[in-house]
């Protein structure tokens, strides 16, 4: 026998009982896997994740409460499972247990708040202050502009852009990468930029332009590559005001106008649209994944609302009529929360009700979280 070959001892075969038990266990696992696939739309995996995540929060604990200075000008948004608050006195961040992790002092007459992945962006609309902060690092960007800040945006990877002006120029677009370093500046001496957006990766940016032709105002969207000195493309919109811009996954840009919602690629080709027809846009959110949420009203006043979710190809995914006053909407991931005068309800993207609570006394705002839970904000907490 060769020295480098080991002699193998014959192994004992497992008993019949053990083999049967192993077979039954395997069958159960296979059946469970098949059931999980077949009924994947009905299984509430987010509920399980929330249960595991919040096991350490007892009913009598104060964990999960967010204490802040209340003001009618406050703006709220979710951040990393916690909360971001922009107020007249600055920007505050809280983790998922309600512990304040950052507090940036800044005077803001009209605070506007947006969040990315780990960074919250707050600025004073029409003022000169912009702040960005994360829960782990605190302040990551401070801008004190000599001219008014007209708009700002933050991408899913925390890239940032904002609009202002400089002497001799009508508009200036500034773009920062995900490490909040300034990488691009576009100066326009001939055009007024009204809105801006930046894509994840900070390779692309966009600005809504208000111009004039034949005595009538004309809107357009200008697309930029931040590694080029030339305009990438210009998308004509027509004589409709542009309310908002937002880059979607795959570098699709969403353009929200006063009369319609559009989706374009970087070449300016329209990928889909949804016309408002005779309804009036009352509120909206471009947050969430896979859809845009619109609150429409049949009249300029009154409570004849219809909540719509629109897919990125312009297809209506769901519609929810309601006669209750809508106080706030918020979206994150696959979920949407709707706060009315009578309840707080959570829906999926097709507006199928997921959960509802009638205990909303004193509530003025709500923040949807990606795991399917929501933060209800009232009376400073």
Give, region by region, the residue ranges found by the protein language model.
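N-terminal Lys/Arg-rich, disordered targeting/topogenic segments
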Residues: 1-19
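Hydrophobic membrane-insertion alpha-helices, especially the h-region
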Residues: 20-37
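Structural motif
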Residues: 40-41, 90-92, 128-132, 168-174, ...
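A short beta-strand motif characteristic of beta-propeller blades
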Residues: 53-68, 97-105, 137-144, 181-187, ...
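Repeated scaffold domains used in trafficking and secretory/extracellular systems
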Residues: 65-77, 106-118, 147-156, 190-200, ...
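Hydrophobic beta-strand positions that form the internal "hydrophobic ladder"
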Residues: 83, 120, 159-161, 202-205, ...
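Non-cytosolic head/periplasmic domains of membrane-anchored proteins
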Residues: 102-208, 215
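Acidic, serine/threonine- and glycine-rich low-complexity intrinsically disordered segments
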Residues: 187-312
């Amino acid at each position: 026998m060769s020295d480098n070959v080991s002699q193998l001892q014959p192994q004992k075969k497992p008993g019949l009982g053990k083999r049967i038990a192993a077979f039954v266990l395997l069958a159960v696992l296979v059946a469970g896997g098949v059931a999980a696939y077949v009924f994947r739309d009905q299984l509430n995996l987010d509920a399980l994740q929330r249960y595991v995540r919040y096991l350490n929060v007892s009913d009598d604990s104060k964990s999960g409460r967010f204490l802040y200075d209340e003001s009618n000008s406050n703006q709220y948004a979710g951040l990393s499972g916690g909360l971001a608050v922009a107020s007249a006195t600055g920007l505050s961040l809280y983790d998922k247990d309600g512990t304040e992790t950052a507090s940036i002092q800044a005077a803001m007459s009209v605070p506007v708040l947006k969040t990315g992945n780990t960074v919250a962006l707050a600025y004073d609309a029409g003022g000169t202050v912009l702040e960005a902060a994360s829960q782990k690092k605190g302040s990551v960007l401070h801008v004190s502009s000599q001219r008014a800040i007209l708009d700002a945006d933050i991408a899913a990877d925390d890239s940032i852009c904002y609009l202002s002006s400089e002497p001799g120029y009508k508009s200036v677009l500034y773009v920062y990468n995900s490490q909040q370093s300034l990488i691009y500046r576009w100066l326009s001496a001939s055009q007024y930029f009204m809105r801006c957006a930046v894509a994840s990766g900070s390779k692309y940016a966009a600005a809504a332009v208000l111009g004039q032709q034949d005595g009538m105002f004309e809107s357009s969207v200008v697309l930029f590559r931040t590694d080029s000195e030339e305009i990438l493309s210009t998308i004509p919109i027509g004589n409709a005001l542009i309310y908002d811009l937002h880059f979607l996954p795959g570098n699709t840009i969403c353009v929200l106008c006063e009369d319609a919602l559009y989706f374009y690629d970087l070449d300016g080709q329209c990928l889909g649209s949804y016309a408002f027809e005779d309804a009036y846009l009352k509120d909206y959110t471009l947050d969430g994944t896979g859809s845009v949420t619109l609150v429409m009203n049949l009249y300029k006043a009154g409570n004849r609302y219809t909540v719509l979710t629109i897919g990125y190809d312009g297809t209506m995914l769901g519609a929810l009529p309601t006669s209750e006053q809508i106080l706030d909407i918020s979206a994150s991931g696959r979920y949407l929360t709707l706060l009315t005068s009578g309840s707080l309800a959570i829906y999926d993207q097709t507006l199928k009700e997921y959960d509802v609570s009638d205990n909303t006394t004193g509530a003025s705002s709500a923040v949807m979280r990606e795991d399917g839970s929501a933060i209800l904000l009232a009376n400073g907490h």
